[in-house]
Amino acid sequence: MKYILIKLSIVMIFIINSASKAERIRDLTTIVGVRDNVLIGYGLVVGLDGTGDQTTQTPFTIQSLRNMLSQLGVSIPSGINMQLKNIAAVMVTAKLPPFVKIGQKIDVMVSSLGSAKSLRGGTLLITPLKGVDNQIYALAQGNILVSGFGAQSGGNTSQVNQLNGGRISEGAIIEKSIKTDFDKREIITLQLNNNDFSLAQQISDAINTYFGKKSAYPTDSRTINVILSASYDKSEKVKFIARLQNIPIIIGPSDAIIVINSRTGSVVINKEVMLNSCAVAHGELTVEIKKRTKVNQPNTILGGGSTVVTPETEILIKNQGDSLQEISSSTNLNEVISSLNSIGAKPNDLMAILESMKSAGCLNAKLEIN
């Protein structure tokens, strides 16, 4: 009897673990106050092979060049109209990581602001990067790496990927760090990646089990406050957070969600989605308009006729109505995919079908339309 109970308990544990999975707190949450800050700057790219801005169309490029040269001690008479093709005005963006120190380097993104055809082979001149407080936090400069390429000949153009944007790896040097009071805080606030009351309480319980009672408490479906344990002083906060973030959390199945992007027509379905039995018919209405010009040239013996040009328009409407298609109930992702593929609908049509199935109660999932 004892052997049977032990064997049964092992089977039950296997079933529970197969339906749930263990995640670390660091994978489910972020720490409030520990985040990136965005930086932005305006600069010039030089050294382009005739693919820069058309200076007549982008006067701010020449204005920026004049200002830069004047700061370097080079003066250009106001009457001279410079027609340059190897320079481009750009916007430079970057993310300032948390706790970064002066002298460290970060990556920057460079994007064309004017009419430049390509930034390939260009060099970004020194560009100050500012935060929302208008303070300079970094200086960017370097050669731009453009992933795309293109060719043009005889009026024909071939292009792969984007040529008007590029990246400079470690292209900016930090000149100022952001002040923070993180080391003085006695309460660490965790923020869930997704709203979930049960998960917030579950994480709080796991922290209290690990560090002791009343160490953590949730304030809402997304926020958990964690009090620095009495066994850790402020100088050991990093050790405390490291152990906190690695606490395992056994979470159950996630919500059934279908994400629809109306612009690209993409549909993403997670494994929790289930379908109930239903019948679907989806018709397609096609309207085709053809315009042509008919020329009537009279061919008479006496002459005197004139050429008549008359437009002709043909409108063709097709209504391709499909018969009802039965969809059986599906309990896993493979069955859901097979059932939806049996309809034979295109992605754009599938979005309308899923919305109708949701309204009819045949789809047990949340629809997120972007």
Curated annotation (Swiss-Prot):
Coiled coil: none annotated. It is found in: Bacterial flagellum basal body. The keyword Membrane does not apply. It holds the Pfam family FlgI. GO terms for biological process: bacterial-type flagellum-dependent cell motility. Keywords: Bacterial flagellum, Signal. GO terms for molecular function: structural molecule activity. One of its GO terms (cellular component) is bacterial-type flagellum basal body, distal rod, P ring. Residues 1-21 form the signal peptide. Its main location: other. Belongs to the FlgI family. The basal body constitutes a major portion of the flagellar organelle and consists of four rings (L,P,S, and M) mounted on a central rod. Assembles around the rod to form the L-ring and probably protects the motor/basal body from shearing forces during rotation. This is Flagellar P-ring protein. It comes from Wigglesworthia glossinidia brevipalpis.
